[in-house]
Amino acid sequence: MEEELKCPVCGSLFREPIILPCSHNVCLPCARTIAVQTPDGEQHLPPPLLLSRGAAAAATPPDQDAAAGATSGGAGANTAGGLGGGATGGGDHADKLSLYSETDSGYGSYTPSLKSPNGVRVLPMVPAPPGSSAAAARGAACSSLCSSSSSITCPQCHRSASLDHRGLRGFQRNRLLEGIVQRYQQGRGVVPGAAAAPAVAICQLCDRTPPEPAATLCEQCDVLYCATCQLKCHPSRGPFAKHRLVQPPPPPTPPEATPAVTGTSTASSAGGCRSPGGAGASAPRKFPTCPEHEMENYSMYCVSCRSPVCYMCLEEGRHSKHEVKPLGATWKQHKAQLSQALNGVSDKAKEAKEFLVQLKNILQQIQENGLDYEACLVAQCDALVDALTRQKAKLLTKVTKEREHKLKMVWDQINHCTLKLRQSTGLMEYCLEVIKEDDPSGFLQISDALIKRVQTSQEQWVKGALEPKVSAEFDLTLDSEPLLQAIHQLDFVQMKLPPVPLLQLEKCCTRNNSVTLAWRTPPFTHSPAEGYILELDDGDGGQFREVYVGKETLCTIDGLHFNSTYNARVKAFNSSGVGPYSKTVVLQTSDVAWFTFDPNSGHRDIILSNDNQTATCSSYDDRVVLGTAAFSKGVHYWELHVDRYDNHPDPAFGVARASVVKDMMLGKDDKAWAMYVDNNRSWFMHCNSHTNRTEGGVCKGATVGVLLDLNKHTLTFFINGQQQGPTAFSHVDGVFMPALSLNRNVQVTLHTGLEVPTNLGRPKLSGN
């Protein structure tokens, strides 16, 4: 709170604060210091005025703008006499500044200067000319100032306000702030060795040491006078005739826990002003009076001027035509508004405290994370150094092995060549000795064998025998440039794991036995995703498996089980790794199967119409067409209506694998399980094996039903609602697709999406 109690000009606690038109506060002595003359009057301002105003700012007691002795501090008594018995002294004339404003609003603008504190122009202390007295200087200043105009600039918002004929007395005194400052000073405790508060109130204008006890208190000036100073500084005539002089109040006894504060005395002596009752003591609270009608108390509040007024101001003053409200009601209303505003500020202050706690936690986390990252960096670099050391050892081992291998090869070749050379040299020397002999018969006895030996020895020195088997150069080249580049490029990657993808439920849907999922990356993410991984369970609550990996954010999965519940989830990945999973979405496939004939898998002679629900053939041979659905679990039922039946053909109905042979009747290979039927009877067929002939055939308008129960692994056929023979096939397992074979004499229409009928008839007995 102390910052709120300091003057923006002097930086000390407020002394006699006044309220400027902009609602900011400033000390009265400081206000005298920063009050400046307008350009019109400033050029005629004599230098002695500056000295007079500087002295007044340093030593003027409270509310003594009209007192002649109040302009010179402790020497006020003598100065008042020097100025004569005028209505006001030099200080009063200094405060009576004429009107000046840049606009009619009473406010002006001012650009702060680097040479002025707080953007306020402070008048320098210019010495008086030689040979002139202070009284003469003040007199000259007063006479000059009466004909000049002045203004004051707020040190906080830098708005200028012109002063009327009352000068600074025209600004209201902030007694509330003054009382808060006094209580704050008293509550700060006593400095050891401080003097105790005086037992009686003392005069605030005495230049004697010690000051005389106060005899009177002026309610309008709020100043304590002794008898002598009252006669000199506050005579009961002129402008002081209407002032009310009362007995000074007794000084309050300070509590033992919080005695008088030395700081208050220091501030008072430094500023040249003391509170009534002496240092460290505050006068009892009294109601402020109107500055224009000094005998009247405030009773109303002017809404237009936003200031309290008395009833005289309403009757004859400038507030007579203004909107006014009762002072007490307005006081309570403004208190309520202030309390409400304080609640908002309190909430913001609470948020700010929590935010500061959060910032301090962030500081601690930064310290901890910094240490962790440093340790991690050291560990990673040490691991790289260790890996490089191990690789260095491996490479050195390879070089050593290569060197030893080359040395061994060379030594082996040296030994072999040395042996051959010794043998050849010995043979050569022996042959030379034989040639030297002169015995022909002896020579011829061994010449043939010797010639063969020499030839054999010569053949041993084949081509390449005198060439080194290995080179002195090593065929090992270490390319360290990529590793050096990688080391130079080793740096921190400003990327983290991607965030959790958000599933867009409004775009997720199921259709038949396929599901479509959509997702997106959260907004304002700083870790973009390079791709996504979509996982789906098996429809029975089993483990998840990846069904899609890519950059798209929309995926459709076909070929799922009907009447099944699937759980799906997605996660993102980037170069830093794989992010967390999204929330799991539950998808329910269709209860019954909806499908048509598949034009892509059917034989080219098959003719489809009616949105691929009606099939016929252009050939007299049987051709196969499959459905678009595939079943591996559940119970499924569909019907085929015979639209045309000519010349007693044998259409076949059933199920098949996707790889079934399509240019012959259904059931002749091991990829199909079927019932073929004519107009009189039917047979079951698989792997070209005909079984269970049953009476009863089909004709135009007949309906053939197929029931595939993969829970019981059975296949059953029906004609016109009656089961045709026993259960056709058992132990069927795997993935099956609806299938049909027919020729040009038959046309059938497929009906799907049917519930399993509960009123199917009993089976017909088979003929065989």
Swiss-Prot record:
Entry-linked Pfam families: ANCHR-like_BBOX, fn3, SPRY, zf-B_box
Protein's GO biological process: negative regulation of Ras protein signal transduction; positive regulation of neuron projection development; positive regulation of ubiquitin-dependent protein catabolic process
SMART domains, per the entry: BBC, BBOX, FN3, RING, SPRY
Zinc finger extent (RING-type): 7-42
Ranges annotated as biased composition (Low complexity): 55-70
Binding sites annotated in the UniProt record for Zn(2+): C290, H293, C313, H319
Gene Ontology CC: one annotated term: cytoskeleton
Subcellular location: Cytoplasm; Cytoplasm, Cytoskeleton
COS domain: residues covered: 435-493
Coiled-coil spans in chain: 332-369
Disulfide links within the chain: none
Chain ranges of zinc fingers (B box-type): 201-248, 285-327
UniProt protein name: Tripartite motif-containing protein 67
Organism in which the protein naturally occurs: Mus musculus
Native organism taxonomy: Eukaryota, Metazoa, Chordata, Craniata, Vertebrata
Gene name per UniProt: Trim67
